[in-house]
Every structure is written in structure tokens, then in C-alpha cells.
Swiss-Prot record:
The gene is alaXM. Transmembrane segments: none annotated. It holds the Pfam family tRNA-synt_2c. This is Alanyl-tRNA editing protein AlaX-M. Its cofactor is Zn(2+). PROSITE patterns: AA_TRNA_LIGASE_II_ALA (PS50860). InterPro entries: Ala-tRNA-synth_IIc_core, Ala-tRNA-synth_IIc_N, Alanyl-tRNA_Edit-Domain, Alanyl-tRNA_Editing_Enzymes, Thr/Ala-tRNA-synth_IIc_edit, Transl_B-barrel_sf, tRNA_SAD. It comes from the Archaea.
Length: 245
């Protein structure tokens, strides 16, 4: 099984790895990776793999999880790369940092604003989708008072400027279910194969089960702006927000 490097270090930009297998000359599984695979509403990382033997470069255009494997879809960058990667090759992975860091800001911001909506409005978060320019949060809320969301934005931005530390933990599934009441329900939805749960804690604010990439403190978000609110029928609502740069 691939060692997941971003679970405890989201700021790792480069890493060394060994190719374990290659499918159709372009789907590469490594023994360890810092590339984030698309999941949980967060798009995948991109970047490149550089073969140690000859410096041949391969662009990583997409990363996904298939049948338990983290698969890196590659395309050759130069002539040497046309030979392709094979099992046993040693490579250096390089993350597209601008893209990764933008998603980190978006993801931690999503936890902040979602927590505010839950606490202040009593909403139940039902989904999210991150983007580079804007992200969305879906939630269930019967009394949909749009005017209150300006206040929720202010509360979220106050949390952001307070520079709350963000901590990452890997705990056993049993520990998560026993000690954290909120995770008891969430963990029941996990595959039985999952023995460890990755937790993301914003100190003094919230702790969630989440596999995404996050910042070290809320201050790095800088700020958010709620762009649009939508009524999706019955009690289903949607909110779009952007980052302040």
C-alpha cells in the first residue's frame, strides 16, 4: 500500500519514491506519494515525476484512487520520457505548489465557514466542492434567512484573523469512535477496511474526520467572501465563497 505523505505534512513539495507498477504506460502507482488524489470534494494535485536515472520528466495531469491504489496519470514532457516509466524506477515527485496551496487555503476555509453555519444557524452540512477560484458548501436548513449570512461571514473572518493552529492526527478507528461523539456517526460510513482515521483540528473551533490538505493556521486563509446563496429545493441550500488575497 502506498505511504501517504500528505496526511501529516501538507507542505511537502518534493519527495523521492519508487515506481511499483504502471498500467497502460500512463497510470503510475508509487511506494509513497505526496500527491493528493481527487476525493472528498477536493480536486487532485498536479505536478511532475522526474526519473532519477536520466532526468526524464513526466507531467502528472491527474491523481485518483482506484481499487485502493493512488494512481498518477502521466504524460511525457520530453523525448527521453517517451520511453515511459516502469516498475522499479526511482523518481522525484514535484508538486504544483501554487495549485496545492490554493486548495489548502480553500479546504481549511471550508471547515471554518461550515462550522460557523452549523453553530449559528443550526444547519447540517451535506457536501462541498473546492475550486481554485471559488468553492461551495451544501447544507440542510429549513429557515433560510439570507440576511444572516453577512454576519456569518464576519464571524468566519474573525476566526481566520485569530490565527488558530491547525493540527493533523492519525488515530485508530476505535479511538475515533470512542472518544469523539461527532466522529461516531461519520466513522460508521467508512469502509470496514479503514483502520485509521485522519483528524483535522482547528484549535478551539472544530475537529473533523478529513483526508484533505490543510494549512498550519487559519491566518493563512487571509479571509473569505460569500459570493452567492442558492435555494436548491425543500431544505437544501448552497453557498459559494471566494478567498480574499
Amino acid at each position: 500500500m502506498t505511504e501517504v505523505l500528505y496526511f501529516l505534512d501538507c507542505y511537502l513539495r518534493e519527495f523521492e519514491a519508487i515506481v511499483e507498477k504502471v498500467t497502460d504506460d500512463k497510470y503510475v502507482v508509487l511506494d509513497r506519494t505526496a500527491f493528493y488524489p481527487e476525493s472528498g470534494g477536493q480536486p487532485s494535485d498536479t505536478g511532475k515525476l522526474v526519473r532519477e536515472e536520466d532526468g526524464a520528466e513526466f507531467e502528472v495531469v491527474y491523481v485518483g484512487k482506484f481499487n485502493g491504489d493512488i494512481s498518477h496519470e502521466i504524460t511525457p514532457v520530453d523525448g527521453n520520457a517517451a520511453l515511459g516509466l516502469k516498475a522499479g524506477d526511482r523518481v522525484r515527485g514535484i508538486i504544483d505548489w501554487d495549485r496545492r496551496y490554493r486548495h489548502m487555503r480553500m479546504h481549511t476555509a471550508t471547515h471554518v465557514i461550515a462550522n460557523v453555519i452549523e453553530k449559528e444557524a443550526g444547519a447540517q452540512i451535506t457536501g462541498n466542492q473546492l475550486g481554485l477560484d471559488k468553492s461551495r458548501v451544501d447544507f440542510s436548513l429549513e429557515a433560510f434567512d439570507r440576511d444572516k449570512f453577512a454576519e456569518y461571514e464576519k464571524i468566519a473572518n474573525k476566526v481566520i484573523t485569530e490565527n488558530h493552529p491547525v493540527n493533523l492526527y492519525l488515530v485508530s478507528r476505535k479511538e475515533a469512535e470512542e472518544k469523539l461523539s461527532r466522529l461516531t456517526t461519520l466513522a460508521k460510513g467508512f469502509s470496514e477496511e479503514i483502520s485509521e482515521v485522519r483528524l483535522v483540528e482547528i484549535e478551539g473551533i472544530t475537529i473533523e474526520a478529513c483526508g484533505g490538505t490543510h494549512l498550519k493556521n487559519t491566518g493563512e486563509i487571509k479571509g473569505i467572501k460569500i459570493e452567492k446563496l442558492q435555494n436548491k429545493g425543500k431544505s437544501n441550500r448552497r453557498m459559494y465563497f471566494t478567498l480574499l488575497d
